[in-house]
């Protein structure tokens, strides 16, 4: 599975309220405004050093990436195996405020991170061995290519049917003024139904995550309720505009 693989046909899970037609109503042309204010790109040398650090920390063992959101449906590495897995003590949360990518300064969006508490069912992917450094570098560039985000990568224990493994994951335990923790689901839905940036909308992000989790037999209770609420919000917005 590679980042260049063709997108699979969109087949929403049975009973899903948030459809591709509703998602299409949230997509708007937006300019690329560059990185979030105050963020600075890692240099090529810094990315290489960081990739080497994580390569060394894997101690020659298979290196697994724990995916719980967009890395499931849009990875930027070459995987040779995957398994369902559970990270205990963490849960998905739309808590990262974004004014770029899938949000804008006028209508900030929310992206997912892992916050403390509960459990998170996701998928672990094993990186290809022969160019491990390059594979790690690719995923670091995608996930934390800014100096301010370096601390957002961490190792977590993930439980699988084949046993427990140590996996690298991203945006676990974020802190700071950009974090909006414990928002009510209806407030999150209000934001996701409206926010859009140059790479797409927050509703699109939610839709892709829910349908790909379902392909692995994972139904996150909060995300499932959230997609219902976002669908209702989108319908309400367009009824008002009609």
Which ranges hold each PLM region?
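A glycine-rich, hydrophobic/aromatic-adjacent loop/helix-cap motif
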Residues: 2-242
């Amino acid at each position: 599975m590679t980042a260049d693989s063709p997108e699979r046909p969109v087949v929403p899970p049975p009973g899903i309220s948030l459809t591709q037609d509703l998602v299409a109503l949230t997509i708007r042309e937006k300019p690329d405004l560059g990185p979030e204010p105050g963020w600075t790109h890692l240099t090529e040398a810094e990315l290489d050093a960081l990739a080497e650090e994580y390569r060394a920390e894997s101690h020659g063992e298979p290196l697994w990436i724990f995916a719980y959101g967009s890395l499931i449906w849009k990875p930027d590495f070459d995987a040779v195996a995957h398994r369902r897995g559970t990270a205990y003590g963490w849960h998905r949360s739309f808590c990262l405020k974004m004014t770029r990518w899938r949000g804008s300064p006028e209508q900030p969006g929310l992206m997912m991170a892992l916050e403390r508490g509960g459990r998170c069912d996701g998928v672990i992917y094993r990186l290809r061995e022969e160019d491990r450094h390059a594979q790690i570098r690719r995923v670091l560039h995608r996930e934390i290519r800014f100096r301010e985000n370096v601390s957002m990568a961490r190792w977590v224990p993930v439980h699988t049917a084949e046993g427990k493994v140590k996996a690298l994951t991203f945006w676990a335990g974020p802190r700071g003024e950009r974090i909006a923790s414990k928002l009510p689901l209806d407030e999150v839905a209000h934001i996701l139904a409206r926010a859009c940036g140059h790479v797409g909308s927050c509703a699109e992000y939610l839709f892709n995550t829910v349908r790909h989790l379902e392909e692995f037999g994972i139904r996150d209770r909060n995300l499932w309720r959230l997609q219902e609420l976002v669908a209702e919000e989108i319908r309400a917005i367009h009824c008002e505009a009609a």
